[in-house]
Amino acid sequence: MVTEVDARLFLDDASYPTSQARIEVGFDHVGTAGRDHYWINWIEPERSLLVGWHQDETYPEFGEVHLQISHENTIVEHLPAEFIDSHPRDVLSRRLDQLPRTVEAVQWQESRPIGFDFE
């Protein structure tokens, strides 16, 4: 599923640097480890930014779920994320609730994201 959003409205921040964003969501019921895989991404095309949660086996060192920032197809940061053992609809609802705070935690330097700051 892909939906276009007005970033300033979604984040409730009239000063946010871009208004164009989209949210991409996908679920693969029964991934290769017998567990559902999913991705929930915030994408800003103008700034070549992707912030997203991924439940898959691509980075096992971060656990079952990781949060990442990518910029211009380069991963900037990975963090372990909370595993939500629930119905996919509940996972999506909870991640969408977390999304504004997560996007706002992205730190920038010289027009490039450099990581998260959740302080």
Where are these regions (language model features)?
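Negatively charged, low-complexity tracts enriched in Asp/Glu with abundant Ser/Thr
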Residues: 1-35, 116-118
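Extended aliphatic helical segments
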Residues: 2-5, 25, 30, 51, ...
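Residue-identity detector for glutamine
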Residues: 20, 55, 68, 98, ...
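Hydrophobic transmembrane alpha-helix bundles
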Residues: 27-40, 90-97
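An exposed acidic His-Trp-rich patch
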Residues: 36-89
